[in-house]
Amino acid sequence: MNDFKSIIGKLATGVTLSREESAGAFDAMMSGEATPSQMGALLMALRVRGETVEEITGAVAAMRSKMLRVTAPADAVDVVGTGGDGSGSVNVSTCASFIVAGAGVPVAKHGNRALSSKSGAADVLAALGVKIDITPAEVGRCIKEAGIGFMFAPTHHPAMKNVGPTRVELATRTIFNLLGPLSNPAGVTRQMVGVFSRQWVQPLAQVLKNLGSESAWVVHGSDGLDEITISGPTFVAALADGKITTFEITPEDAGLPRAGADVLKGGDAEANAVALQGVLDGKPSAYRDVALLNAAAALIVGGRANTLKDGVAQGAQALDSGAAAAKLKQLIAVSNAAA
C-alpha cells in the first residue's frame, strides 16, 4: 500500500495523477487493498481539486478491467445518465432505449437503482416486469433475442462492493458518479451519456475518446437535466471520426415543441412505469417528446440517423407502429425466461 500512500501524498500537494497512477489507485480500491480512510482521502482530494481527464480515464480503465462482461453486437448503443441531477424526472433514457431498439438499433442499457430520484432505470424496469437480477450471459441473450438488454450495475461491477460503504459514509458526489455510465459491461463504443453538470460535458467526451469509443454524445440540459431537455437548449460534446465538437441544440432543431421541466416530474417506480408504458402505447405528451429527442440523438450516435429531425421521425415510427412497445414485451419475456 506504499504506492497508495504516495499517491495520497501527491494529491495533498495539489499534484495531478497520471492515467497509470489513477488506474493503479482505483484498482487498489476496488480490489479491497486500500483502507476506508485511504479511499475517503483520495476521493475527497480529487473532488475538492476537480478530477482531470487523465485521472478519470485511468479510473474508468480500472473499473472496466474488473467488470463482468456481456456479449453484444458491435453496433449496440447505450443511453445512460449519471443521475444525481436532483430533478426527480421521469425515466427519459430508459424510455428512449425502447424507442431506439424499436427503430432497429440494438441497445445494451447499463443502469442502477435511483440515486437522487424516486425511480432509477432498475426501479422502473422492475416495476414494468423486467427481471433485472440476471447473469451476464442471460443479458447477452436478451440483447440477441429482444434487441435490448439491461445490465444491473451491482451484478456487473462486483468489485464496487469494496468501495460502497466509503461512498455511503462520504454522502457526497465523487468521481464514482461519473465512472458508472462510462463503464458499460457490454463494451459498447457508441454511447449517449447524460451528465449532471455542464462542466463535465466536454471532459467526458474526451475520456470516451481516450478509451476507444467510436461515436458518442455527452449531454447536459440547460435546466439541469442529465438528458437532452425540451425546456430549452442542451449542451453537447459529440465524438465522431476521432474528433470532438461542442454545440447546443434545442427542441426546435428536432421539430419538437418546448415544455417546462416541471411537466417531466416523475413519481415512484410504479407511477413512472405507468407513464413510460403510456409513451410506448403512443400517447402524446411532453414525456413522449423528450424521449423522442433523446432517442434521436442515440440514433445519430448509432449511425442510423443523420439529423435530429430524421431521428425523431424514426423514433415516432417505432412508437406509432408498436415496435417500441414490442421491445419491452420481448425484454420482459426473455429476461423472465432466464433460470
From Swiss-Prot:
Signal sequence segment: none
Matching Pfam families: Glycos_trans_3N, Glycos_transf_3
Chain positions recorded as 5-phospho-alpha-D-ribose 1-diphosphate binding sites: 81, 84-85, 89, 91-94, 109-117, 121
Cystine bridges: none
Biological processes annotated in GO: L-tryptophan biosynthetic process
Matching InterPro entries: Anthranilate_Pribosyl_Tfrase, Glycosyl_Trfase_fam3, Glycosyl_Trfase_fam3_N_dom, Glycosyl_Trfase_fam3_N_dom_sf, Nuc_phospho_transferase
Record note on cofactor: Binds 2 magnesium ions per monomer.
Residues that coordinate or bind Mg(2+) 2: 226-227
Superkingdom classification of source: Bacteria
Keywords: Amino-acid biosynthesis, Aromatic amino acid biosynthesis, Glycosyltransferase, Magnesium, Metal-binding, Transferase, Tryptophan biosynthesis
Chain positions recorded as anthranilate 2 binding sites: 167
Enzyme class name: transferase
Transmembrane stretches, start-end: none
Molecular-function annotations in GO: anthranilate phosphoribosyltransferase activity; magnesium ion binding
Pathway note: Amino-acid biosynthesis; L-tryptophan biosynthesis; L-tryptophan from chorismate: step 2/5
Catalytic reaction(s) noted: N-(5-phospho-beta-D-ribosyl)anthranilate + diphosphate = 5-phospho-alpha-D-ribose 1-diphosphate + anthranilate
Keyword Cytoplasm found: no
Any Gene Ontology CC annotation: cytosol
Family: Belongs to the anthranilate phosphoribosyltransferase family.
Subunit structure: Homodimer.
Protein name (database record): Anthranilate phosphoribosyltransferase
Species this protein is from: Rhodopseudomonas palustris (strain BisB18)
